[in-house]
Design a protein with these regions (language model features):
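Generic structural signal for well-ordered alpha-helices
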Residues: 35, 139-143, 169, 173, ...
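Loop/turn elements at helix/coil->beta-strand transitions in domains of secreted/extracellular proteins
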Residues: 16-17, 42-46, 147-154, 179-182
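C-terminal regions of proteins
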Residues: 170-240, 254-257
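Active-site-proximal beta-strand/loop segments in catalytic clefts of secreted hydrolases
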Residues: 21-24, 50-52, 156-159, 186-189, ...
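Acidic-and-aromatic substrate-binding clefts and catalytic sites of carbohydrate-active enzymes
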Residues: 25-29, 131-133, 161-168
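Secreted/periplasmic serine-hydrolase-like ester/acetyl group-modifying domain
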Residues: 51, 60-152, 231-258
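A generic structural signal for well-ordered alpha-helical segments
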Residues: 11, 146, 175-176
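Membrane-embedded segments
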Residues: 1-79
């Protein structure tokens, strides 16, 4: 989600304040810990979980503590070079994230000419793919946490033809129906998303243009299904407006350099 969702684009278009806490190779177990910590300190209006993590390994392996606790520190984007970090790196974000005005979003304007199989979501009747027992257990914990703090939980799936199909989509749909949760799967169709130029890799991570399409579609879905306040330009949210200016300047500057 750190590549496919831009909180500042959401704020610019809909005035919703948000933060993306995703990190690479994150486990659902770590998300559960993360959410518990956040809910103790913040009054959230909505929690959004990206569904791809429900089919990722959830077992601790050597070095996984780096991923499980990466969200506690600033360098979300440094996950592949922990041993090379300097002390200052634990308090500053790299590249466009310096100053933290991207709110967890990882910017990339790289375009990979990806040829998606047009039928990767064709078989809508595929049997639901089962999830690990630990995934079901941790998902239930997340569900209970949201219930405890009276926060709606929305599950989404960002376009990911590299690893997604209808078996997984139906598995998540079945899981969400069990707990009476909303599930928004953008793989089933997303207006304006171009699979040939909206990825920075082989169909797994969106680039900036892809993230904009995803973010605005998500914003529309939230507007139609949830009662969230538009804070843009309102008093007490001046810092967000200043952050948005920084964000736009940084992206314009970076794009110009390219």
């Amino acid at each position: 989600v750190y590549s496919g969702f831009s909180p500042m684009e959401l704020y610019d278009e809909y005035g919703y304040t948000s933060y993306g806490f995703g990190v690479a190779k994150q486990t659902l177990h770590s998300v559960c810990k993360q959410l518990k910590s956040v809910l103790k300190r913040q009054k959230l209006k909505l929690v959004i979980l990206e569904a791809d993590i429900l089919y990722q390994p959830n077992i601790k392996k050597q070095g996984s503590i780096h991923y499980d606790y990466a969200w506690l520190f600033a360098p979300f984007m440094y996950h592949s070079r922990w041993k090379d970090l300097k002390l200052r790196d634990f308090f500053t974000l790299p590249n466009l994230n310096r100053g933290n005005f991207t709110n967890g979003y990882f910017y990339s304007d790289k375009v990979n000419d990806f040829n998606v199989k047009p039928d990767y979501m064709k078989d809508i009747h595929k049997p639901p793919q089962k999830m690990e027992k630990s995934i079901n257990k941790d998902f239930y914990k997340i569900y209970k946490l949201c219930k405890k703090y009276d926060v709606p939980l929305l599950v989404i799936s960002i376009p990911t033809p590299h690893s997604w199909d209808n078996a997984k989509s139906n598995g998540v749909k079945e899981l969400c129906e069990r707990y009476n949760l909303d599930f928004y799967d953008m793989n089933l169709g997303l207006d304006g998303f171009d699979y040939s130029c909206h990825f920075r890799d082989n169909g797994n991570h969106c680039n900036y243009n892809g993230a904009k399409v995803v973010t605005l579609a998500l914003g529309k879905y939230l507007q139609e299904n949830y009662s969230l306040a538009n804070h843009k330009g309102k008093s007490n949210f001046e810092n967000w407006d200043k952050k948005l200016i920084e964000y736009k300047k940084a992206i314009a500057s970076y794009s110009h350099k390219k």
